[in-house]
Amino acid sequence: MKIIGFNIEEIHARKSFDFKRSAISTDILFTNIEKAKLDVLKDDEALKISFKFMVGYKDGEKKDSQDKNEVLIQGSILLMVSKDESKEFLKSWKNKEIPKDKALGLYNIILKKCSVKALQLEDEINLSPHIPFPQIRNQQQN
């Protein structure tokens, strides 16, 4: 399995209330797997794996509210796989699953690419970052 493409297809960010750092959640959902046609591949096959990367902000005071602070990034990963790997992916997807031995690498590339984009959006609309930043502190002298 080799990643040959990563595409962001939709970006959405919304701030509808001032957030008081109650809970921030990050989630990745795989939404579809399908064969992709690439003429340059001779012995291998290409798969397009669609995903959603979501950052949600919950305010403890606003239970069941329609107000939401969120960042949503939808995209796809293009994989070059062997014919056997392709069959394995498509068979697993019938149960809406990704093969366990392949999922970790896919999650990591999505986190790497989308977290950077989400941090930029959070900064632009003044949401708390979903990842803590390192901070420099004064050293205490004895």
Predicted regions and their residues:
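N-terminal intrinsically disordered, cationic/polar leader segments
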Residues: 1-109, 123-142
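Helix-rich interaction surfaces within compact, conserved domain-sized segments
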Residues: 111, 115-117
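Amphipathic alpha-helical interface segments used for dimerization/assembly
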Residues: 118-122
